[in-house]
Structures are given as structure tokens and as C-alpha cells.
Amino acid sequence: MNDKRVFQNGRRAFAVFRRGDFQYNGVMEKEHFEQAVTARFLRRVNRFIADIELSDGQIVQAHLANTGRMQELLRPGVAALVRPAKNPARKTAWDLIAVDHGGSWVCLAAAWANDFMREWLSKGRIAGFYDWKQIEWEKKIGNSRFDFAVTLQSGERWLLEVKSVNYVIDGHALFPDAPTTRGRRHVEELLALREEGWQVGVFFVTMGQPVVDVGFNVENDPEFARVMQRAIAEGVDVRAFSAEILPPDVYFRGERPIR
């Protein structure tokens, strides 16, 4: 099945999670890193390609699924985690998925923040969503698509957007590390849908580094910072959560304050 919203669980597939349909078995925490091997990051060729050195000394190119600048992370010679591409016919045979920064593995695959959040929601780790009835992802409403639509047992409906954060200065995480017109548009669309009866939230996920709090990068993207301040003022549920990467596992390390 090609629908990205479908979660595979053994021989069964669900386009949504429904309470009673799905029993968590721990697979999602391991599947991202179970084939990871150590390597050395050499240089970023372009937004999506990096040169890496494998443990046998072979220099190859790897796909980087993150358009952020990440200059503080992608330093020549830093230890990295790579895994074989799922498509053996792809031009780049490897995915660059994490680098070491200050002794912590930092996940570079921005889309995996959604995978982590999907797991945390389904396991009842997120306060306010313990009594979920149904979880959908990549929910399309009109011409827009949102990361999650969650229906609670009470019938309350939520739309959630998830943002991956790996830009950290002295323990303080900032989003974004580069201007994001798309990110701002998502928040503006959520604000509009709130007026149509949806409850809405923006959840930030820090991708491996220990952080004290999460804030908005006014210097890099003042427009995004402004729309987030408006969202908070209008009652949008804005929260941050921390992940720790200890391959092959990903651990939920709780909520962090928004500043």
C-alpha cells in the first residue's frame, strides 16, 4: 500500500489508529535505527547530498532528508550514523540519519519527528490526548494537509502540526534554523480552522540533544516567530517534547517549556 497514512502492523494495515484496533509492540522505536552503522561526515555537497566515509574507508554519497542549514551539526569529520537506502536502485545507496554532537546522537531526518509523535500519541505519552479514540495522519482538509487529526473519546477534534528541532544553543532549542514560509503557512491555516470548530496545536520535537526549553528563532525567521506568538495569544496548544537517540532505540524524555 502506498498511502503514507497507513501503518503496517504485521499483516494488518490501518489508515488510522482506533482504540482497540492497535496494540503497540515497540517496533517503531527501533525500525529507524536498527540498520544504522557508524561513519564519518565529510562535507555537504548540496541540500540533499552529503559525502561520508564508511568504516572501511570507502567514501560514498548519502541522502540527507533535511533542508535546514545545520551548520553547527554538519562539521567535517564528525561521527555519523547512516543506513542503507530502502530502494537499492536509488542514486545514493545510503541515508545520513544522525550525527554526534556533544556526545549525543542528533537525528537529521526531519520527517521522523512525525513518526516519534505518532508513537507517543498512540502510547498515551502526550498529556491531553490519553483518551484518544482515533488518530489519523497526513489529514487533508480542503487544499491543505496536516500532520495529525486526533479525535478524543469526548468527540473533541484536534489538528496537530509537528516541527522537528535540532538547532540548539547552550541547551536552548530554537526553531527554525532557516526561514520557513511553509511552516508559517501551516500555523496560519491552523488558526483559520480553529474558527471552524477544530482544536489545534503545534508540537515541537527536539531530535536528540538535551535541551532546557524551546523558543522561536526571531533572528532567522521573524515572521514565523510573530505568527507563533499570535497562535499562543489565541489559545493554540503550543508545546515541545524531547527525544533521546540511543540506537537502535528512541526514548521519550518528556515535555520542555516554550519560551
Region spans (language model):
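Short nucleic-acid-contacting surface segments enriched for D/E, G, S/T with interspersed K/R
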Residues: 68-81
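Flexible glycine-rich surface loops and low-complexity tracts that mediate binding to linear polymers
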Residues: 78-87, 242
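Nucleic-acid nuclease catalytic cores
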Residues: 171-181, 188-220, 242
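Conserved catalytic cores of phosphodiester-cleaving nucleases, focusing on short active-site segments
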Residues: 39, 146-177, 190
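Acidic-basic catalytic patches of nuclease active cores, encompassing PD-(D/E)XK
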Residues: 71, 102-136
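Short, positively charged and aromatic/hydrophobic N-terminal segments
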Residues: 23-24
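Short aromatic-glycine-enriched beta-strand elements
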Residues: 47-51
